[in-house]
Amino acid sequence: MIVNAEAFLQMYKDVWAGESVKPRGQLCKEVTDYKLSLNMSDSPWTSFKARNLNIKYAKQEFLWYSRADKYDNSIEEYASMWQKIRQDDGSYFSNYGQYIFPKQFWFVVNELLIDPDSRRASIVLLKSEHLFRANKDVVCTYAINFRIRNGKLDMTVMMRSNDCIFGTTNDVFCFSMLYRMVHSMLETEVGTYTHFVNSLHVYEKHFPMIQAIIEGGMSNYMHVDSFWPTPNEATMAVFGRLMPNDGKWAKWLYE
């Protein structure tokens, strides 16, 4: 199945055909209010040879979220950009785990167990104080909504901003892991993931890369298998206690 890879390739084409804008003086191409629809039965990890993304980093970012510690600087070992956006007090606004785990995660699960037709099963990430101009790190995600419709679990992620070269793929991976954790707690079929972004963009320095991805097409696609958590593994992750020997999903994340 290559449904998600085709959706990503179309996304790159759409962004490249977008408008030129210069937020904070940085030239980029942008499409607004973009919707990326993904089949959660397919792999959430989409990589192309022209931009061979680092799945080890994506796993580490998710595990970093699961620890839910806004002062945990271990992520800087895997990507130097985190050092550049660390707040003066040593914290990171964009460690999403501090908002998700454990309280909001369990709210979503319990809400859907009590009322499978609920529209309230949401996780809110962005706070007004994140948007202050003096902040180095500004949260890119507004909220995540989960719904059960026609017996399937659907998820919508709503973002204000997303860099399609680096951000989108890693965000989709991490949010897909969150989806799998919620799914493990419910008796539903697998549904869809809608990734909605106000500003989906590519920076000027990555123009050659996005052109190479588009020109290579599906011949550049590289599939990566992944695992689903058991309820026990998901629970361990919620409390930041997931260890490699907790199961196949845990072992795969730590590889």
Question: Which residue ranges define each predicted feature?
Answer:
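Terminal, non-catalytic protein-protein interaction segments that mediate quaternary/complex assembly
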Residues: 1-255
